[in-house]
Amino acid sequence: MIKPNFRHIINGKRLATAIAQDYKTGEILMVAFIDEEAFNKTIQTRKAHYYSTSRNMIWYKGEESGHIQEIKEVLLDCDEDAIIFKVKQVGGACHTGHYSCFYKKLSDDGEVVTEYEDKVFDPEDVYEK
């Protein structure tokens, strides 16, 4: 089986970049890091797992919120160090409550001109404090 090239080293951990994309619309939902163990769990379960560089641990997307990502297809780039997971997103992908983490549009001078997406859930109702 071909595996990603986990060439990015952060906090001593070998990682690759993972992009979650809506399998129907092509909308980019989020970008995260993934290590070999999280990649293997993702392939085995067909549910997205990532590696948190701030918590130094694997996390199952939706473990706390229930907003999981069901894997439909996996793509590797030419260097095999970036992965696209084409997913069926259940609920929102972003911890802010938005469907996608990419909901801010910037003007030419870099100012946020709009948040063009309504929230699909209230984070205060989902995440423990």
Curated annotation (Swiss-Prot):
EC number assigned by the record: 3.5.4.19
For the biological process aspect of GO, one term held by this record is:
L-histidine biosynthetic process
Q: Which reaction does it catalyse?
A: 1-(5-phospho-beta-D-ribosyl)-5'-AMP + H2O = 1-(5-phospho-beta-D-ribosyl)-5-[(5-phospho-beta-D-ribosylamino)methylideneamino]imidazole-4-carboxamide
Extract one GO cellular component term from the record: cytoplasm
**Entry cofactor note text?**
Binds 1 Mg(2+) ion per subunit.
Complexes and interactors: Homodimer.
Q: What is this protein called?
A: Phosphoribosyl-AMP cyclohydrolase
